[in-house]
Each structure stands twice: as C-alpha cells, then as structure tokens.
Design a protein with these regions (language model features):
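Alpha/propeptide regions of enzymes that mature by internal proteolysis
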Residues: 1-112, 116, 130-132
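Short, structured patches in soluble enzyme cores that scaffold and shape functional sites
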Residues: 120-124
C-alpha cells in the first residue's frame, strides 16, 4: 500500500455531519458529488447484509495494484448512498468483474470508448425493487 493509499483509507472521526462531509471531499473520496459519511455503523450494516466481515477480498485491480476488501466496497457504497439490501448485488457484480479481468483492464486502459454493461435479472431484481 502506498502512502497515498494509506492516507485515502484512514478513518475520520467528527461529531459534525457537515464537517465529516467536507473531510470526505478533502480526502479525495468524492469527485464533488454529494456523499454520505461512511460512519462505522453504516459500513457494518452493509457488511452484515451480505454476511461479510470486512476482510474478504472482493476484487483485485491489478492494473492499479489495488485489492478491494469488502470493507472498502462497503465504505464506498455508503458514501454513494447505496441501501444495505443492494449491497449483496454490488459485491456479486464486482466478483463477476474479477472473473473478466482482461475486459476490465481493456475498458479502463483504452483510448477508445468501450464500456462495461451489466444486467440484473431474476428474483433479486424484484426483491430490491430494481427498475425494469
């Protein structure tokens, strides 16, 4: 883990919600879009919904020399406003991308315009209320 990675994964504590949001911006955890501060209890709620501990490796991004753990993914999901009941779908989606490493690398390294498209189908679609 580089110094930059260590800095980006630090835990921030604040009793002021607005200050916590501003710290997310200062840490580079957002590109300017609104965020929900990834407070511990919200991250744990995500992990519990998927039956995860926070230590599991969800996906390895070799082109960026990064490994995303379930805790990393949960914190980002909280910041994006993801509901806990969606989190198992999110982790499954990322694990699917792990199986298609070559395509993920090609899509992220291309100077063209490839895109990754995923479809959600089956009973889970109705269970979480996804549009179709």
């Amino acid at each position: 883990m580089t110094t930059n990675d260590m800095e980006r994964s630090k835990i921030v504590e604040s009793s002021d919600t607005i200050e916590a949001i501003e710290e997310c911006y200062r840490m580079g955890w957002s590109d300017g879009l609104p965020v929900v501060p990834p407070v511990d209890y919200k991250v744990r709620e995500m992990l519990e919904m998927a039956g995860l501990t926070g230590e599991e490796e969800i996906i390895s991004l070799e082109m960026r020399n990064r490994v995303l753990t379930s805790e990393n993914v949960a914190a980002n999901a909280v910041m994006a406003g993801c509901l806990p009941e969606y989190f198992p779908v999110l982790t499954t989606t990322l694990k699917t991308l792990e199986e298609e490493k070559n395509f993920v690398h090609m899509a992220s390294a291309s100077t063209s315009s490839p895109a990754i498209m995923m479809l959600l189908n089956g009973p889970i679609r109705d269970e979480i209320g996804a549009n179709y």
